[in-house]
Amino acid sequence: MTRLVKALVIAYQRFFSARRPYRVCRFEPTCSEYMLQAIDRYHSRGILMGLARILRCQPFARGGYDPLPDHFTLKRNQPK
């Protein structure tokens, strides 16, 4: 399952995201990069983390730097 999701995310990055003249994602790393990192670190639970991040990425979101946390969570990292 994780291989399929990773393949879909990579296809999205190469064929859709790369063709846009501007950056769409409000977060750093982008939502697709975050999803790939989450799957690599947390396997199938990383898919849930990536989906939660995509749901947070909307026009009224604060955005900014939101790295992958050290532990599994579906919430945004809180600045220290």
Curated annotation (Swiss-Prot):
Q: Which SMART domains match?
A: Haemolytic (SM01234)
| Key words of the record | Cell membrane, Membrane
Pfam families from the entry? YidD
- Protein's cellular compartments: Cell membrane
Topology in the lipid bilayer: Peripheral membrane protein
One cellular component term from this protein's GO annotations in UniProt: plasma membrane
InterPro entries (UniProt xref): Membr_insert_effic_factor_YidD (IPR002696)
| Superkingdom of this protein's organism | Bacteria
Predominant localisation class? membrane
Role summary: Could be involved in insertion of integral membrane proteins into the membrane.
**Family assignment?**
Belongs to the UPF0161 family.
Q: Give the protein name, as stated in the record.
A: Putative membrane protein insertion efficiency factor
Q: Which organism is it from?
A: Limosilactobacillus fermentum (strain NBRC 3956 / LMG 18251)
